Amino acid sequence: MCLAYQSGKTSKNGYEYLDDQLGSLKDKVKINQYQSAESVNDLWEARGYKSPYKEKTVVQNITLTEDTKFVRVYDGVNSNLEGGWVMRAEDIKGLTPKEIQAEFALEYEPIFIGEVELKAGDTIHLGEIGPNFGYDGGGIQIDLQQQWIGDFTELGKIEDWR
């Protein structure tokens, strides 16, 4: 039996889909577990949150094998530099704040960007964003799993960074 996933506009076999999710992280992680988005969403819903992951996709539980930099976007009022969700810089480079909001299904349009360095040995979730706040999502998000990890550094306004 061959695993196949349809995500966005393309259909891929299971391994291609999972490799695409990892992107530039592929050689920097150890994969601990594959979980259904539904099972991870159930955990978030039990805590009173909306489902963060797209249904019928896979969430990867991974451990970083080397120090790795990510970015976090925020508006400075409703969200701040430090927080539990980050993304790869290459996933938002060149996007406007409105495009980032749509791709990552953010409640508020981000204004600022910060760099987040996670350490080798940090364990995180990585998966495809589901619909929220009137947006379809579809981007790949990294969940710090409610751990207080990472070194957060302000980079400035998204418009100046992109």
Residue ranges and their predicted role:
Residues 2, 9-162:
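Catalytic toxin/effector domains delivered as secreted proteins or via bacterial secretion systems
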